[in-house]
Amino acid sequence: MPSQAVFLVLTTVFSQCVGKFPIYTIPDKLGPWSPIDIHHLSCPNNLVVEDDGCTTLSGFTYMELKVGYITTIKVDGFTCTGIVTEAETYTNFVGYVTTTFKRKHFRPGPSACRDAYNWKAAGDPRYEESLHNPYPDSHWLRTVTTTKESLLIISPSVVDMDAYDKSLLSKIFPNGKCPGVSIASPFCSTNHDYTIWMPENTKTGMSCDIFTTSKGKRATKDGKLCGFVDERGLYKSLKGSCKLKLCGVSGLRLMDGSWVSIQNHEEAKWCPPDQLVNVHDFHSDEIEHLIVEELVKKREECLDALESIMTTKSISFRRLSHLRKLVPGFGKAYTIINKTLMEADAHYKSIREWSEIIPSKGCLVAGGRCYHHHNGVFFNGIILSPDGHVLIPEMQSALLQQHIELLESSVIPLMHPLADPSTVFKGDDGAEDFVEVHLPDVQKQISGIDLGLPEWKRYFLIGVAALTLFALTIFVVVCCRRVRRRERAKPNPVELIRKVSVTSQSGKVIPSWESYKVEAEGQSQA
């Protein structure tokens, strides 16, 4: 797509302004000037940025960001909370039943949460039944405790994913970040110990659908990779690139802000935290049309200026500005010294701020120093005004500033993994700390005899009962002793008959009633 190629060309390989975007190109290396004829003038090819000597091309396949990729990656998931419901039932003397419900929490397991979510998603009645309170049981003068464990599923719970380290961002996570989910750790801990977060789809829920596969050509020199030609035919140099992972995929961030899945570039180092990648959304397509028109216009202006030079056999400083190379790389620089057209080999670099090349009044930095002008003329149409100020024609381009603002707004505004190393992956994943809890059956526990009294009344009743029992014991013991005494004092009936004696009227002891009777009868007869 030509608009894409132009858009990427305009931002290719800028200077050492880390995290910045180019606004102008200036020679950082400028060869000796040599006179030329006007027939040697040519318009630069700004569609190609080539490295010298990289002429060996071979086909290969790579991945790059999709067109229309949106910066925020949403991941649908759900939260799972472990709930324990207790039903405490007490039955008093008269059979009155009192039931009290209590709720506690427990730490759920990922497998049980996945089962509960599947039940809820499928409309399985087992999920609703698992949330019901336990059916209370009762026993006379006893407290019956019935417990039931349930898993409460709340969905959807949408979180953001950081494309740089595939971590998850949400306020429900500790410190607002979760290192991510995997087979070993299929969940994220939350701010509550009894709640975990899991993705809805275990297979595609965490995949980054932001890449597209493209075909291009490797550019090598003596077997060393130095660049490649992308699918749109645009050459991209690997100079200044750095290693960067997107969604767990290793690749290179090129200095134009684009990202490709090239991994075998030995010289590349890991990107610093502020090196983000550019995105290409649909809104930028509208601006790209303006950029394409501007580039075509620049090309036409350069050709018109060149035609005018050839026709009139005359040249001006303004016309020379059209011959400047608009992208970093090797090119030509032109100037007029003592009314003679001069040419020099140059290597262009990008700048971000005008102050980089105009640090003070009358100073134009080129080649690492304030460049010496010749009668107020520098090169590429840059001149010195009568009041001593450096004048650059492109400084008046409003569209250029609009293009820079577009690039800045296209940076992925998410946290880079190197920005805060303490929040990235930790040594231990908390998966093993969780117990695999499947929804258990209702548990019932029956206590001993309980009168349903408060604590102090219970002890008071126990004391009264003990005293009563003690008094009753004493009473029984006393009664038993009295009975025993009576039994000991009462004589034997046989012995009583034998020992009975009666004293007669005469004063004589009679051993028995019969003897007394016989004696009494004898006295009466006498």
Curated annotation (Swiss-Prot):
Keyword Transmembrane: yes
Residue spans, topological domain Virion surface: 20-459
Primary localization: virion
Record note on modification: Glycosylated and palmitoylated by host. Glycosylation is crucial for glycoprotein export at the cell surface.
Note: Arg-352 is highly involved in rabies virus pathogenicity. Its mutation dramatically attenuates the virus.
Glycosylation sites: N338
Transmembrane segments: 460-480
Alphabetic keyword roster: Glycoprotein, Lipoprotein, Membrane, Palmitate, Signal, Transmembrane, Transmembrane helix, Viral envelope protein, Virion
Practical applications according to UniProt: Primary surface antigen capable of inducing and reacting with virus-neutralizing antibodies. Almost all human and veterinary vaccines are based on the functional aspects of the G protein.
Side Intravirion, residues: 481-526
Pfam families: PH_Rhabdo_glycop, Rhabdo_glycop_CD, Rhabdo_glycop_FD
Signal peptide stretch: 1-19
Subcellular location: Virion membrane
GO cellular component, one term: virion membrane
Record gene name: G
Function: Attaches the virus to host cellular receptor, inducing endocytosis of the virion. In the endosome, the acidic pH induces conformational changes in the glycoprotein trimer, which trigger fusion between virus and cell membrane. There is convincing in vitro evidence that the muscular form of the nicotinic acetylcholine receptor (nAChR), the neuronal cell adhesion molecule (NCAM), and the p75 neurotrophin receptor (p75NTR) bind glycoprotein and thereby facilitate rabies virus entry into cells.
Name of protein: Glycoprotein
Membrane topology per record: Single-pass type I membrane protein
InterPro entries hit by this protein: PH_Rhabdo_glycop, Rhabdo_glycop_CD, Rhabdo_glycop_FD
